[in-house]
Design a protein with these regions (language model features):
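Intrinsically disordered, low-complexity linker/loop segments enriched in Gly/Pro
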Residues: 1-22, 27-35
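C-terminal functional regions that serve as terminal interaction/effector modules
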Residues: 21, 28-32, 36-38, 43-160
Length: 160
């Protein structure tokens, strides 16, 4: 994933989550990326302090994604007058356990953070219940580097 590009897009709105092992993650608007070793200071000093943010990061990092590899299947423009930023990239995987295809879509802005060498995997996380007690499932793309280390995540859009 392109950390510098993500950092520029986040600006001062990003939040930093530090794990107990010392790894730091920059998170903003459903996207998170591991802060590379050697990066000491960022502009924003905010911390991820709510339970859901920490739960998502911990779930992403500890997820077993070995058999959930995603492949880009299509790009969709929902409005014929839309711009390039309105393109939704749809990824699919076939999970061996359930033998069904799972889809997750991300917007072109988030797609631009990915690199060719990134390995993309699928993850679902149940969100906290809302005020009506309903729990929704959030789909994520978990991004691994070429060595299989988790380096980021992108929350999927509900349009797909």
């Amino acid at each position: 994933m392109k950390f510098e590009k993500f950092l520029k897009s986040v600006g001062a709105y990003g939040r930093v989550f530090e794990r107990t092992n010392g790894d730091k993650w920059l998170v903003c608007d459903g996207v998170g990326m591991k802060i590379p070793t050697g990066v000491l200071e960022l502009l924003g000093g905010g911390k991820v302090d709510h339970d859901m943010g920490k739960a998502v990061i911990n779930a992403v990092i500890s997820a077993d994604t070995a058999d959930d590899i995603l492949h880009l299947s299509k790009a969709v423009l929902f409005d014929r007058d839309g711009k390039s930023g309105d393109i939704c990239r749809v990824f699919e995987t076939e999970l061996d356990i359930e033998l069904e295809t799972h889809k997750v879509g991300i917007w072109n802005k988030e797609y631009g953070l990915l690199e060719k060498k990134d390995i993309l995997t699928y993850l679902e996380i149940e969100d906290y219940p809302d005020e009506h007690g309903d729990v929704k499932t959030v789909k994520y793309i978990v991004v691994l580097d070429e060595h299989g280390e988790t380096i980021g995540f992108i929350a999927g859009t509900y349009k797909i």
